[in-house]
Amino acid sequence: MSFSERLLAAWYQGHPALALLRPLEALYRRVANGRRADFLSGRKPAYRAPLPVLVVGNITVGGTGKTPMILWMIEHCRARGLRVGVISRGYGARPPTTPWRVRAEQDAAEAGDEPLMIVRRSGVPLMIDPDRPRALQALLAEEQLDLVLCDDGLQHYRLARDLELVLIDAARGLGNGRCLPAGPLREPAERLESVDALLYNGADEDPDGGYAFRLQPTALINLQSGERRPLEHFPAGQEVHALAGIGNPQRFFRTLEALHWRAIPHAFPDHATYTAAELAFSPPLPLLMTEKDAVKCRAFAAADWWYLAVDAVPSPAFVAWFDARLEHLLAR
């Protein structure tokens, strides 16, 4: 287990040694609260776009299902006839310059794994830049849009926003409830009181003050050929190597278990890069991975490498709330 994995386990499962980090946590909280106050008070300016901006983000470190939820929002808005764009930091990307327009034919090293996954799945106009206002301005210079989704960026207060949606893993919650480095929170838990909606990944029903959504496996996609097969392509009891380089790899492994496959887990750090030699696992079995990992492995994939396609399925109550908010924002 790597240091980052041990730290995540301590944050979410508890460890007495974390008490030693509380002085640093207190400093982190003061800085985070002060920075937000600077923008809310107007002491520091925020860029206000000429169209609605919806931020989809996390308050915790670790995966929450954000990318599938963004893909759902893209398709849902398009079904209403809306022109949607996306901006992202492009974590881990090394583009020739910024801002950088992500296109499907690029590779993950250039575009970032999550932005490339979004573009390949949806074809949405997407611009990456650590400077979110600059990314948005560049996107608007190229596209006529009705609204923009900001992938992450909850803490990027230089970008004014019209709606804040925060995703939380229902099983892990807020961990020990403490801020970095003593816990997994990027901002104090009180920050959740000011967001527009909380979405709980994996909740069985809408919790008090929030909405449930789940990730629904839909198909197996072959990395080499692009062939789409039903989940029944792997029968119950099928043994596979399972690769997950995401913020919460155990959720992926649990999904495979729920599908009655016998997975040999191989967890890697979030946004990890791979080589064919690293993934030559023994014994020789089909390799099953996340879609996010697949965008980094397609160039050297073997014939029996597959990814599990999943779709976000939000609760009907959230869909109704989201539609009402869209109508309000677009009428202004």
Swiss-Prot record:
It catalyses: a lipid A disaccharide + ATP = a lipid IVA + ADP + H(+). Pfam families: LpxK. It comes from Pseudomonas aeruginosa (strain ATCC 15692 / DSM 22644 / CIP 104116 / JCM 14847 / LMG 12228 / 1C / PRS 101 / PAO1). GO terms for biological process: lipid A biosynthetic process; lipopolysaccharide core region biosynthetic process. One of its GO terms (molecular function) is ATP binding. Belongs to the LpxK family. Pathway: Glycolipid biosynthesis; lipid IV(A) biosynthesis; lipid IV(A) from (3R)-3-hydroxytetradecanoyl-[acyl-carrier-protein] and UDP-N-acetyl-alpha-D-glucosamine: step 6/6. HAMAP family: LpxK. This is Tetraacyldisaccharide 4'-kinase. One of its GO terms (cellular component) is plasma membrane. Its EC number is 2.7.1.130. Transfers the gamma-phosphate of ATP to the 4'-position of a tetraacyldisaccharide 1-phosphate intermediate (termed DS-1-P) to form tetraacyldisaccharide 1,4'-bis-phosphate (lipid IVA). Keywords: ATP-binding, Kinase, Lipid A biosynthesis, Lipid biosynthesis, Lipid metabolism, Nucleotide-binding, Transferase. NCBIfam families: lpxK. ATP binds at T60, V61, G62, G63, T64, G65, K66, T67.
